[in-house]
């Protein structure tokens, strides 16, 4: 947006390949106060976000190292927040962890008589997000069960086996990729009218 405003302000600004941080720093040198204020606010927001991510990384390494090794600190923290605590996450089955964060989609699909969602917040995991659509449900189920195991270990025993869990999960994903390389043929479901 700052690039668009700058382009409107100056017809000579045609370099659209300028990185965002450099763009904001260039705008700070100008005397247009609106763009300057916007650039300052954006740079502060980026700095705040980076500091927040570092803080979450440190806390997750202390609180839930196995979950962090399996999902990453940001996704792990989001799952703990959705479960309202690591204790609740540790007591959940893998199938519920798989669907954490999909409440709106679940009830929307139920209302419209569609199939329920296969994954919730764990869709943000790169191995699920990057997988073909027909493999995502299987990978989500596997990740949900591994997160359930990791959260139980983090809450009850504090023993670190995150690397082994991550290796097992990656092996399972490879097996899914090999077992289901092609998309299944879509079947048309014929429903009979109830009379």
Provide a role label for each language-model segment:
Residues 81-156:
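Phosphate-backbone recognition surface of nucleic-acid-processing proteins
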Residues 5-9, 42, 83, 150-154, ...:
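Generic structural signal for hydrophobic core residues of well-folded globular domains
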Residues 133-137, 141, 150-195:
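Low-complexity, acidic/Ser/Thr- and charged residue-rich accessory regions of DNA metabolism proteins
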Residues 26-74:
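Helix-hairpin-helix/helix-loop-helix acidic hairpins
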Residues 33, 37, 44, 66, ...:
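Extended alpha-helical surfaces
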Residues 2-4, 147, 169:
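A residue-level signal for conserved active-site and pocket-lining positions in enzyme catalytic cores
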Residues 57-89, 94-98:
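Long, well-ordered mid-to-C-terminal structural blocks that present hydrophobic/aromatic surfaces
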Residues 3-27:
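Extended compositionally biased segments used for macromolecular assembly or nucleic-acid engagement
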């Amino acid at each position: 947006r700052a690039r668009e405003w700058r382009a409107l302000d100056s017809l000579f600004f045609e370099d659209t390949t300028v990185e965002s941080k450099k763009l904001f720093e260039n705008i700070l040198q100008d005397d247009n106060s609106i763009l300057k204020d916007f650039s300052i606010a954006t740079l502060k927001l980026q700095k705040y976000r980076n500091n927040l991510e570092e803080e979450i990384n440190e806390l997750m390494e202390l609180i839930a190292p196995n979950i962090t090794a399996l999902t990453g600190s940001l996704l792990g923290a989001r799952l703990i927040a959705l479960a309202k605590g690591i204790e609740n996450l540790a007591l959940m089955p893998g199938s519920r962890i798989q669907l954490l964060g999909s409440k709106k989609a679940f009830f929307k699909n139920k209302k419209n008589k569609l199939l329920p969602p296969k994954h919730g917040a764990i869709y943000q995991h790169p191995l699920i997000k990057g997988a073909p659509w027909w493999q995502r449900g299987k990978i989500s189920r596997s990740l949900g069960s591994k997160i359930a195991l990791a959260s139980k270990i983090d809450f009850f025993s504090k023993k670190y086996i995150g690397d082994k869990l991550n290796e097992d999960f990656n092996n399972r994903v490879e097996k899914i990729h090999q077992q289901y390389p092609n998309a299944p043929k879509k079947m048309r479901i014929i429903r009979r009218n109830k009379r």
